[in-house]
UniProtKB/Swiss-Prot annotation:
Family under the similarity heading: Belongs to the cycloisomerase 2 family.
Organism superkingdom: Bacteria
Protein name in the entry: 6-phosphogluconolactonase
Record's function text: Catalyzes the hydrolysis of 6-phosphogluconolactone to 6-phosphogluconate.
Species, as recorded: Salmonella gallinarum (strain 287/91 / NCTC 13346)
Record keywords: Carbohydrate metabolism, Glucose metabolism, Hydrolase
InterPro entries recorded: 6-phosphogluconolactonase_YbhE (IPR022528), Cycloisomerase_2 (IPR050282), Lactonase_7-beta_prop (IPR019405), N2O_reductase_N (IPR011045), WD40/YVTN_repeat-like_dom_sf (IPR015943)
GO cellular component, one term: cytosol
Molecular function, one GO term: 6-phosphogluconolactonase activity
Designated gene of the protein: pgl
Enzyme category, top tier: hydrolase
Catalyzed reaction equations: 6-phospho-D-glucono-1,5-lactone + H2O = 6-phospho-D-gluconate + H(+)
Record HAMAP family: 6P_gluconolactonase
Keyword presence, Hydrolase: yes
Biological process terms in GO annotation: glucose metabolic process; pentose-phosphate shunt, oxidative branch
């Protein structure tokens, strides 16, 4: 298995393309100059394209991924109705979802042969929209509205339109600020990191009709932490055993173990990391975690070790200015 790591640096308008070997070492393959401040990225389900959100001219860009080394070639672009904060796709590679914090909306763009071709629809009124997350069954889109302390639930129609479910939303505790999410591999649980109080909520998917319930809320900060809380990103290992979330003020990654059924998280430790970690990701083997320091202008590679999933630093690498997003592709 070959793996490529992509890092987005908006201040220098660059994507760095890295090869990740089995020992956790990165080798630079390419530096791509992007026509705009690159914000958020996602790899297509068939692993052939990288979709990138840019500003100040709000667009989604599509880059072809070379099958031999992961290098990028520009392929297409499509306009967006707001500054892209988070980008994702459905599991069949038919649609791109873009959440916009500043515009307070989520948009759907149709893909044809892997390329963005037209805007299907926009849902407004999502104050502080920070991500769009399709459920494993490809039926429901979860959209956290950070400023409203709610997660909105939409059914994805066959033609890409979003229809509010019943109930249409679930609420977090006041002042939590739901931000990013991941789903457990068993499809029964989801985990949401809350930006404003640096907590993680565990949501149980109770039935196929979209009914969900919060079954646990866990503080992700050390007991003696007294500064402003500012959580950012969250990811789970492919085997569902370990979960990680980062806080930008503390510049740390919190390590969680996950119960066998996915219902319970336990804090295992705290890993100091690059300054102001805005984004990170986990490789497809579940062996390495790559974190980006928005203020250090570096990325760091950690090995995930032991039964607790603690992190051991393997190396750090200079990237562009203000790196904020990391994605990993395996092929």
């Amino acid at each position: 298995m070959k793996q490529t790591v992509y890092t987005a640096s908006p201040e220098s308008q660059q994507i760095h393309v890295w090869s990740l070997n089995h020992e956790g070492t990165l080798t630079l393959v390419q530096v791509v100059d992007v026509p705009g401040q690159v914000q958020t990225m996602v790899v297509s389900p068939d692993k052939r394209y990288l979709y990138v959100g840019v500003r100040p001219e709000f667009r989604v860009l599509a880059y072809r991924i070379a099958p031999d080394d992961g290098a990028l070639t520009f392929a297409a672009e499509s306009a967006l109705p707001g500054s892209p904060t988070h980008i994702s796709t459905d599991h069949h590679g038919r649609f791109v979802f873009v959440g916009s914090y500043n515009a307070g909306n989520v948009s759907v763009t149709r893909l044809q042969d892997g390329l963005p071709v037209e805007l299907v629809g926009v849902v407004e009124g999502l104050d502080g929209c920070h991500s769009a997350n399709i459920t494993p069954d490809n039926r429901t889109l979860w959209v956290p509205a950070l400023k409203q302390d709610r997660i909105c639930l939409f059914t994805l129609s066959d033609d890409g339109h979003l229809v509010a479910q019943e109930p249409a939303e679930v609420n977090t505790v006041e002042g939590a600020g739901p931000r990013h999410m991941v789903f457990h591999p068993n499809r029964q649980y989801a985990y949401c990191v809350n930006e404003l109080n640096s907590s993680v909520d565990v949501w149980q998917l109770k039935n196929p009709h979209g009914e969900i319930e919060c079954v646990q809320t866990l503080d992700m900060m050390p007991a003696d932490f007294s500064d402003t809380r500012w959580a950012a990103d969250i990811h789970i290992t492919p085997d569902g055993r370990h979960l990680y979330a980062c806080d930008r003020t503390a510049s740390l990654i919190t390590v969680f173990s996950v119960s066998e059924d996915g219902s319970v998280l336990s804090v295992e430790g705290f890993q100091p990391t690059e300054a102001q970690p805005r984004g990170f990701n986990i490789d497809n083997s579940g062996k390495y975690l790559i974190a980006a320091g928005q203020k250090s202008h570096h990325i760091a590679v950690y090995e995930i070790t032991g039964t607790q999933g603690l992190l051991t630093e393997k190396g750090r690498y200079a990237v562009g200015q203000g790196p904020m997003w990391v994605v990993v592709n395996a092929y």
